[in-house]
Every structure is written in C-alpha cells, then in structure tokens.
Amino acid sequence: MKFTPGAVEDAPSYYVDHDNGKYNTQKCVILRNLGLEGDDIAMPASLNHLAKPTHILDLTNNDLVFFPDLHHRDDIETLLLSKNRLMVLDAALLPSKLKSLSLAFNGIENFETLIPLSHCPSTVRDLVLIGNPICHLSEYRQRILALVPSLEVLDFKLVSQAEKAQAVKDHVAVMKKIKEDNRQIHQRKKKALAAEVDGKNTFGRNTKSLTEAAKVTKPRDKTIEVMNTVVGKLTEEKKKKIREQLANASSMEELERLERLLTGGV
C-alpha cells in the first residue's frame, strides 16, 4: 500500500530510553508490517505529517526499495528499515543527525549497493546489516568500516580501536575507487537509458538491462514492464527532449530522475 497522511498521523507510538538512558524521553513511531511502498509523491507528502520530535522511526517489514527522504529531520536518531526490499541506498536522504541505522534482512548481496553509505551523516555510530547475503563475503567487516569510518558498532559488535584505525586509513583509498566506479556506472546507465528511449533495448530480453548496468541484482519485473509501456507511448518530440537531458546529465541524481520519469515513478 502507499503512504497516506492518515497512516502516519495515526501510527502507534511510545516512549523509550534506548539511547540516552533517561526514562521515557525518546518517541518511537511505529509504521511496520504495513506493506508500505515508496514513491516520489505520496511518501514524502505523508511523512511531512510525522510528529515532531520523533526520535525513532520504525519502518520494519514493508516494501520500500529506497530510503524515505528525511534529510531535513534533525530529530530522528534511529531509523529501522529491516525486512524491506531496499535496492537504492541514497545516504543523502537520511536524517541529518542519524545515529543508528538498521538495514537487516534486505537481501543486499554486493558491496556496490552499499557504496552510497560512504556519504552517511558523520553522526552515524551504529549500523546493522545482519541477515543480508553480503555479510558472508570476504573482508565484509573491514570493507563496511572503511565505507563508514564513524561506526562504533557494526552488527551489534563493538568496533575495536585497531579496526577503527585501519578503517580511517582505508577510507581514502576506498573513496578514490568509489569515485572511479561511479563514473563507469554513470556511463553505463546513461547508455542503457538512451538505448531504451531509442527502442534499441528492451529490459530483460536480449541485452543488458538498466538494472544490471546499475549493478542492482534484485528483480524489478514491475519496473521493467512499466518502463516498456511508458516508452512505447512517448512521442518523438518527448523522446528527443529526454535524449537531450540524458546527453547533458552529469550526475547519478539526474539519471535517477529520468529513470523515474520512464518508469512512471515505480
């Protein structure tokens, strides 16, 4: 189901003392187990109705594929997003003073998906990724700490001083590699979108899909179906404008906007 203002306003809430140890001073809002889906219209409009202050936002066990845009909220310290279907982890959308983030059981399989977490707020101290296939990969812990060197706890285990020191050293090299990888992904994604607009590529059939080009490993059947339908209905004039925007796109954000346009906001 989509987010609605009513669902947010009527969400159960209670007070806890998880972070500061002071009795019942932190408000936790519960929006879990509702099958909530993210979009660019209903979700942000509905979350504008989220009570202030809210210190803990529980969105566990929904159908979100990207982070809700909470970058303007400096009151939310804990964000619980376990058991969703997260594929796009844009850290720029996270609350500005976030301390704890749970992404457990989201089917995250590769480090590329987690690269945007390198831009997490510097306040993030606690990250949970347990239950994701990536946890079983070689050097998992070391690589995550290099991405987010501010962490003090990873998967409920304290980060040692030795780990923290190594993470700080690795961070510079990791960021350099990320920059180059992003450049290559940007080019592949731009080509894939342009091919789709030109009718030379139908996702999921005879060439590499946009999903593969962007290194997203989860199936996106609904997105593929809608994109093919939307592109098929575009006029030549509209296609020309989109081609021009693609040619001038210089950031992943611009490409994501164009992708959402072609998928009807799915």
UniProtKB/Swiss-Prot annotation:
LRR repeats lie at residues 30-51, 53-74, 75-95, 97-118. GO terms for cellular component: Prp19 complex; U2 snRNP; U2-type prespliceosome. Residues 132-170 form the LRRCT domain. Keywords: Leucine-rich repeat, mRNA processing, mRNA splicing, Nucleus, Repeat, Spliceosome. Its main location: nucleus. Transmembrane segments: none annotated. GO terms for biological process: mRNA splicing, via spliceosome. It comes from the Eukaryota. Involved in pre-mRNA splicing. This is U2 small nuclear ribonucleoprotein A'. It comes from Candida glabrata (strain ATCC 2001 / BCRC 20586 / JCM 3761 / NBRC 0622 / NRRL Y-65 / CBS 138) (Yeast). The lineage of its organism: Eukaryota, Fungi, Dikarya, Ascomycota, Saccharomycotina.
